[in-house]
Amino acid sequence: MSEPKKQPIFFPTQSVDNFFDKPEEIVQFANSLEYKTAQSGFWPGKRTEELHINHTLFFKSFLTRLFALFFDYSHTKLRWSDVGMYFQKTSAFDPKDKNNILNTGLIHQDGNFPLVGLVYLTKDACKDSGTSIMLPNKKYKHRPELADEKVRLHKIPQEKLTKKDLEDRKKLILSLNENFEESIRFNNKFNRLI
């Protein structure tokens, strides 16, 4: 895990409910796509290919809608580049116990980008399965070996994790959590953009 970088704030942190006009159609579209586990180990679960490759219309309409939250198109011309956009599926490690520490996401930084976000598209998801924005606490230490361990664990499909892998994930979560404190929490609500 790299040291947290202070970046200028181009886009404020926000939450927008009912982002898509017809979210069920978006879910249907997402479910029609192929998903793959990360060979690189940089993210959990499974993702589609980048959407700009074969789904340009959706890609452009999403970005147009997103940037309309920040810019008045009658006064602004926008161009974008280096945009990564995917659908991603993750699942609980222990669906019977939502409080199992293994169900906690791994603290991470989404690269050095001015804007990152997501839209929750799982109906009736546990609201506590949302997203937390974390800040380094007073105990924070730069520990690059934790990033290596995270990558190793993400490379293994969830259904193939051994008991030792799950124990290693638990240790990793505890090690990461001791360095950060929650600053903002977004609950998982269907069709919410954060």
Region spans (language model):
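Non-heme Fe(II)/2-oxoglutarate
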Residues: S2-G105, G130, N137, P144-K160
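Catalytic core of non-heme Fe(II) oxygenases with the double-stranded beta-helix
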Residues: F93-I194
